[in-house]
């Protein structure tokens, strides 16, 4: 179950790339972030209020300060990540659409993004082989994957659903077994390969959204 559920954030990032890869910089676009900020503040205060009712909330001044450092709600890291990605999207789209007529240009972008963020969790399993400095940039990689799925959706639709489902179930089985053995007789081991930037999560995300 965890192997599937951890794809929720990556799926949202891929969907963002799928839907927003044509957005351009404008005042209207920048102002589009305001509803996100308002929702974040409202939800953070709501969470603080509920925790306060059960005696687990901080004082009000700490809650207000926590809004600015994303600590009032424990899941605020996601909003912190998305705000930055949202502001970057017009620039990412310039990269995506700059030389799209060049053969394999988009494939190169996705490959480099995957090489820097996802592959280190696989290739560095038994020792550092490739740089892993850029793993934290996984939101950008998922965004470009979404843009790729949008741009080449007609070609992707030609892949039979049977092959995709088989691949998904096979990957799910293998990853579940490897994670189970890695955590045998101890608490679940949250490691690079099963993190948001891990190759397991990336593979499950791509196969899952391709099926959808």
Q: What are these model-derived regions, one by one?
A:
Residues 8-23, 78-93, 122-157, 200-212:
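Specific transmembrane alpha-helix
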Residues 25, 52-60, 94-102, 122-129, ...:
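Transmembrane helix-loop junctions in multipass membrane proteins, especially transporters and channels
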Residues 2-11, 20-52, 56-76, 80-85, ...:
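Transmembrane alpha-helical segments and their boundary/interface "anchor" motifs
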